[in-house]
A protein has these predicted regions:
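Short, structured segments at the rim of ligand-binding sites
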Residues: 1-179
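A short, hydrophobic C-terminal helix/tail in secreted or cell-surface proteins
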Residues: 180-186
């Protein structure tokens, strides 16, 4: 299967929200340009090397004044929810302006259950980052919003219970599940 820019971006968000490092093999680095610019604004670092992308999220701590979604090659609307989860953990105020789809902030209500401070008005979401999110019972209502809830759970203290995981499985075949662990894949 060819590398996917949305899946790659989501994994980079996992490194960002956990303030850790990962290596992506054969990512579509050229297609990630707009996303990587935002990642760098947040304080993330990356380096391409021999078909690998070395990603360091340890210094992700800067809010993003304004992030606007756009059609390719702009910032992908499908990475807006995952980035919202990351911005929820960066102290300071960030703003996302959704320019592609209406009603794209379904994950915001669920992230609020985890302690995120997000105000949605029309096509804008203002995120006032908090130091730490906390676990909660949350409901995925669509694929990318569900991915953002998993990311938030990775960066949260406590247990998060996610209902609606089947939405997420449609787009992320290698996320950890008990079945994958039983087969030695987790």
């Amino acid at each position: 299967m060819p590398p996917d820019r949305i899946v790659s971006g989501t994994y980079i968000c996992a490194a960002a929200i956990t303030r850790s490092q990962i290596v992506l093999e054969n990512p579509p680095e050229g297609e990630l340009k707009a996303f990587l610019e935002v990642y760098r604004k947040m304080g993330g670092q990356y380096k391409g090397n021999s078909g690998k992308l070395l990603v360091n999220g340890k210094n992700v701590q800067s809010p993003v004044k304004l992030l606007e979604t756009s059609v390719y090659p702009g910032f992908p609307t499908d990475l807006q929810s995952p980035v919202m989860a990351v911005l929820s953990t960066i102290e300071g105020e960030s703003c996302i302006r959704e320019m592609v789809f209406e009603d794209r902030y379904k994950a915001a209500d669920q992230l609020r259950k985890m302690g995120a401070r997000i105000r949605v008005q029309g096509n804008e979401a203002v995120i006032c980052g908090v130091k730490t999110l906390h676990g909660a019972a949350v409901q995925a209502q669509e694929l990318r919003g569900g991915a953002s809830l998993i990311l938030a759970a990775l960066g949260a203290k406590g247990v998060t219970v996610l209902e609606g995981y089947s939405f997420v499985q449609r787009g992320y075949c290698l996320l950890y599940t008990s079945d994958a662990a039983d087969e030695g894949l987790g």
